[in-house]
Amino acid sequence: MATTAVPAGGLKKIRVMVVDDSMVARGLIIRGLSAHPRIEIVGYAINTLDARNKIPQYKPDVITMDVEMPGQSGLDFLRQYLPTNPLPVILVSSLNLKVFDALAVGAVDFVRKPDDQQSTDAFIAALAQKVIIASNARPRPAAASAAGGGQTAPGAIPKLGPSASLDRVIIGLGASTGGTEATLAVMKRLPADIPPMVIVQHMPPGFTKMYAERLNRLCAMEVREAQSGDELKRGLALVAPADLQCRVVRIGTRYTVNCTPGEKVSGHRPSVDAMFHSMADVVTCRMVGIIMTGMGQDGAHGLVEMRKKGAYTIGQDKESSVVYGMPGVAQNIGAVMIQASCDNVSNVLLRHLKSLG
């Protein structure tokens, strides 16, 4: 087989294999990604058995895969294949809860299939961006699986108990690529009376509500998708809705969230930076900022501002990050007070909260 072409810019093209049983979907993805100067389509497969046979031949850097296919599903394929063959896989799916199961067993990211012609260009642009990110990612199927089990049952986690100091704490957490399971790994280890949390996870429309519901089922605290006006209170975590900026605001003695369709910040909506900057403006409360795995630098500069205002800041370390972009930039610019592995972020957070009395 011919060697992978090198574009004029000197960067080696990313070898992509498309796995989808739909001829229409395959054609759309192949045509769209082939037009990108950084991407080369090296082959396709019509189902997971076909993919298993062709991967050694095509040697892809990244695979795009539908979740629902006849015969063995994409989810079952990932469960069986990724533990011994950790390839970056991007899911291409309609609105489906199985996406989160696939992320739990090691898929790197996902893109929602377009539902009309108008959204096709945006779909291809998003998929191409995620392919480029995934080519530098480190899939963690074993870690992802561990995040879903083997931990203390939510009801068995000791509560923090009454505390006037903790009543004045607000926790912000931001993540992107690899963050759905990293965030779950943190939150499953936190008690039911945790101070209020606001979570920004880059995610397509339709999925943030399902993600919040999943966290709510698996964690001790209440978790739901945020709505403007929701009051921040202990035992409640709010997930920023897709395509809206989510900011913390003060109204008298209360703290609420404001979710608006504003401009993108740091290239994202919702943006971790927008959320962190709003928290930095709320200087009358004790703040904690946590930045997790993700490509780019969204959240890094907002976390700097939080630290300047006296917040306690935590960054996920390189070894446990699927993509050490956001936490890496935050670390490099001095935004992070302490780095921790994904499995230890909750311990670091709880030690800090207990120190506040």
PLM feature segments, named:
Residues 1-17, 22-34, 38, 44-64, ...:
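Conserved acid/base catalytic micro-environments in cytosolic active-site loops
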